[in-house]
């Protein structure tokens, strides 16, 4: 390669123990930082042609100072942390990766769903507290709920939403796909239902939508009040799709039964996050996407995006 690139990975620790130097050093000079403070991002970018990142935010200030930057390679699907307008103004292409973690995210969704219905986590904890006999005699609060004939509402019907629907139907569940209010659908949306109707009828509501102006705070207290008291909310989309103050109120006051999420509005959540105090709230640290198979597919796709860029064939999220 005649013109060697200068490539930097700003938050390499977010993808785990996966060897990357051999992949990217053949394109030029490769540098990686385990994590980067937000205040340091702009200064690191100024000398590099390509930046790889997962959760680092890039705004107007960062693009203004990144005089040599040509390409941002995202190690994921979401891009709400990137100022696409500023990127375009400064001639920087943005490339994300879709579909690499469909199976792993769908698996965690079903893990959440089954855990909420069978109470495995809570039962295990009770046994560890030496309450086996108590549970065997009095199961009033810990009986299993069958999946058969339960209704799963899905918000966001891309690769992951469709895979979750497939899994759910194999467990005997009925699936209702919700429309995002205000969104125009170009595909056949006859099999989609109004959001409020889905919320009223579903037993479990699973979120797999991206964060946009239309989905931010979409699931608020007014909408949760439309749901059954026995309803369960799962969020494997983006944290701000649910208003977390409203979710806390709904869980605390038994407006809905429980919630499980892999994403939060602030990640990691602050120490005083009230949701973390609740027994009917389950959270994992935004790791639904991270399986070994997913990582292999992810970095193969990222390298492919880099090659497409070098061949002037990149489409990406935004392209010059």
Regions found by a protein language model. Name each.
Residues 160:
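Hydrophobic/small residue at the entry helix of a nucleotide-binding pocket
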Residues 34, 75-76, 92-103, 179, ...:
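Short beta->alpha connector loops at strand-helix junctions that form conserved
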Residues 10, 154-155:
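Conserved N-terminal Rossmann-fold NAD(P)-binding element of oxidoreductases
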